[in-house]
Regions:
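IQ-motif-like calmodulin-binding regions
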Residues: 12
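Active-site and channel-lining beta-strand-loop segments
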Residues: 6-9
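Extracellular and secretory-pathway beta-repeat/beta-biased strand scaffolds
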Residues: 2-4, 15, 24, 28-51, ...
């Protein structure tokens, strides 16, 4: 959902500022023929620094008792901070890592608050100590990093503009001692209700800066944009960020109600996007596209306790180099109908859905109980020169969507690698896989003639209670068919390789044809008296067949 912003002339600033498309405009002329304000689609918006505007106004210092109505009860508890006010424009000059407690930290729609700091790496920590939520509806500007901590909740309005060198908003609290030590451990305040952060506005930061929205629940409906930096949506009860500039995140405690939702647009040009929560829902756009030969984007979505449900678009393209990297994990991972993952590039990127290669769980990666690619979903790791890698794992893995890991020209030379694996695996006849090499690695494999398509079922229905439940998952009430002979024969038409491995048994109940220069491997470890059972013809028109049965 792209937000459309336009330029609006501000009489009090005597300048153009970016505002929501819903805001009322102000013409430069009152004549009927005056041109309408220009419109632009926000991608990586670089706002004009507001410091030059404010300093030119010649503001003077006044007592904080007459401070603009949104900010109240300023108390500097560490470092120094001074304030200048002119009507609805407030400038605060602070020392490095200053800590300021507030009774209220709001910015009204007609207000502007600016923190002038010693350098770009300087930070100011603002904490609300009352029971009021923070509502940011106006402009927040700084040459440094701004932290806003409010355990009651934070809402960023649809007309709000945040333009800093780094921005962190959190409903999880942090002690003054941890701030001073630069130990960014944030925790849910004891006995406090679950608090939410919601962004409806525009958040931009300087090059290589970071935006972090941290809370019991986190929701983005607006636009967040960084260039080469990082954007994190983190929902939990205890979270540690070891480096706020290049976040390394330790996700300590989560509960089912800790949810992260993106309905808006998030752009981290050539940077990193982290979404971590108990459950995750994306219906907007997550983009870490790059045009750099030296750097590609990286996206991580981790639903620690529940489902990662993906609609919309996730993109980390790079047409100058290798596409980016994407990892989506959770108890359950679902790529919904119409969802698009695009990691294409000069060389295709890498994506991991539900786990890693063969479900080994290396480096502590979470393995999904169920991973679904719904019909009409797309994974694209294709490359102009070489295809990339797509790994899909689930204890139950249902593949009804499309996976493209093609290179250019001869796919036998430039194609990539696709793995669709799980203890129980079903490849629907609707699925289209384009790659050089395709690995399937379930417990058992059955190749049948095409019947009807799969219908989505819950985990309980896939693994019903009763005798042999885990060994007898269902497909529309029938035994699982791993894939159809049509799917495998179509794939093997032109110089491609399919490696089907099974821990127990491989059963071929319908005919297969292997095309010229293609390779089919049927490999059974032979556990539980398994092996390879062939009940129909396997023919070849210049291809190769390898059969191995262990046990």
């Amino acid at each position: 959902m792209n937000k459309i912003y336009r330029l609006k002339f501000s009489k009090r600033l005597n300048a153009l500022v970016a505002v929501s498309e819903l805001a009322r405009g102000c013409d430069h002329s009152t004549e009927k023929g005056s041109e309408k304000p220009a419109r632009m689609k926000v991608r990586h918006l670089a706002l004009k620094p507001l410091s030059a505007i404010l300093l030119s106004l010649g503001v003077t210092s006044i007592p904080q008792s007459v401070l603009a109505s949104g900010l109240q009860g300023m108390d500097v508890v560490h470092g120094t901070a001074t304030m200048q006010v002119d009507g609805n424009k407030t400038i605060i000059r602070n020392s490095v890592d200053a800590i300021i407690n507030w009774k209220q930290f709001n910015i009204d729609q007609n207000e502007m608050v600016q923190f002038l700091q010693e350098n770009n790496n300087s930070a100011v920590f603002n904490r609300v100590t009352s029971n009021q939520i923070s509502q940011l509806k106006g402009i927040l500007d700084s040459n440094g990093q701004v932290f806003l901590i409010n355990p009651n909740g934070i809402t960023i309005g649809k007309d709000a503009i945040i333009n800093t060198n780094g921005f962190t908003a959190s409903t999880l609290d942090i002690s003054n001692e941890n701030i001073k030590a630069r130990n960014f451990t944030l925790e849910q305040t004891k006995d406090k209700a679950l608090a939410e952060i919601v962004n409806h506005g525009l958040i931009t930061v300087g090059k290589d800066g970071s935006v972090n929205l941290i809370g019991g629940k986190v929701k983005n409906e607006g636009v967040i944009s960084v260039n080469g930096g990082s954007i994190s949506l983190l929902a939990g009860q205890k979270i540690t960020i070891s480096d706020i500039i290049n976040p390394t995140i330790t996700y300590s405690v989560a509960a089912p109600e800790n949810e992260a939702i993106n309905l808006g647009d998030i752009f981290a040009k050539g940077g990193n996007i982290n979404v971590r929560a108990a459950t995750i829902r994306n219906q907007g756009k997550l983009s870490a596209d790059s045009v750099s030969k030296d750097k590609s984007g990286n996206i991580v979505l981790s639903a620690k306790e529940g489902e990662a449900e993906i609609s919309g678009v996730i993109s980390a393209q790079n047409q100058q180099a290798k596409g980016g990297k994407l990892m989506i994990t959770g108890d359950k991972v679902t790529l919904k109908t119409g969802a698009v993952i695009d990691l294409s590039g000069k060389e295709g990127g890498e994506t991991y859905l539900g786990g890693d290669e063969r479900g080994e769980g290396k480096n502590g990666i979470q393995l999904a109980k169920k991973t679904t690619l719904e019909k009409g979903s797309t994974i694209n790791v294709s490359g102009k020169e070489k295809g990339g890698r797509a790994i899909v794992w689930g204890d139950i893995a249902l593949i009804d969507g499309n996976i493209n890991a093609q290179g250019s020209g001869d796919i036998a030379k430039t194609g990539g690698f696709v793995e669709t694996s799980g203890h129980y695996l079903s490849i629907d006849s609707n699925a289209i896989v384009k790659t050089k090499e395709w690995l399937l690695d379930p417990n058992d494999v059955t190749i049948e003639a095409e019947t009807h398509s799969r219908q989505a079922k819950s985990i309980d229905e896939e693994l019903p209670n009763g005798d042999g439940a885990l060994n007898n998952p269902k497909k529309n009430g029938e035994s699982v068919t791993t894939l159809t002979n049509k799917t495998i024969s179509e794939f093997l038409k032109n110089a491609k390789s399919v490696n089907i491995t099974a821990k127990r048994k491989i059963t071929v109940n319908s005919s297969i044809n292997i095309g010229a220069n293609s390779n089919l491997t049927l490999w059974s470890e032979g556990q539980s008296n398994g092996g390879v059972e062939i009940n129909d013809d396997i023919t070849s028109t210049g291809g190769n067949l390898t059969i191995y049965s262990g046990g």
